[in-house]
Amino acid sequence: MKMTTMTSAYANKVLRKLTEDKEFWLKKEDEGCMYVAAADEEPVIPDYNYTSVAGEIAAIDEKIIKIKHAININNVTNRIQVGTGTMTIDEVLVKMAQLNKRKAVLDRLRKQAPKTRINSGMFSSRKTAPEYQYINYDLELVKGEYERVDAEIAAMQIALDKYNQTFEFEVEI
C-alpha cells in the first residue's frame, strides 16, 4: 500500500472506476463459476479461478473502504466558508439535503392558486353551490422563501464544488 494524495472529486472518480472493476469481476465470476455440458460431448470449461477472482474482488473492496473512510474523515473534520459562517463538509451535505426537501415543499406551495374550484362531481345531488379551496398562507412570502432557500442551496453547492476540486487529503491504497 502507498500513500496517495487526492481531492474529493478525484476520489469519487476513483471510486466509480473501482466499482466498474468490481462489476467486471463479479460478472466474470457469475459467468465462469458454472457450465453446462452434454453427456456425449467434450465440455467447454470457462477460464475461471475462484481464488483469483475472489482475491481481485477483496482487493477492490479494500481500496473502496480506504477511500470512503478518507472521504468521511475529510468530511467531518474540514470546514468551509458558507455564507457568514463555517460548516464541516458533512454538515453542508446534511443541510443541503434538508434544504432541498424544504425547497420541494415551497415549490408546491408557490404554484398553488389563491382560490381553486373543487369539483364535487357532475351528479352530486347534495350540493348545488360550488366549493372552493383557498390557500391559508401569504403566497408572496412563500415565493420569497423559495428564492432564499434556492440561493442558499446554490451558495452551498458552489462552496462545496470549490472545496471538492481543490482541497487535497491523503489516502493509503
Language-model segments: what does each one mean?
Residues 1-173:
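Structural preference for solvent-exposed beta-strand-turn elements
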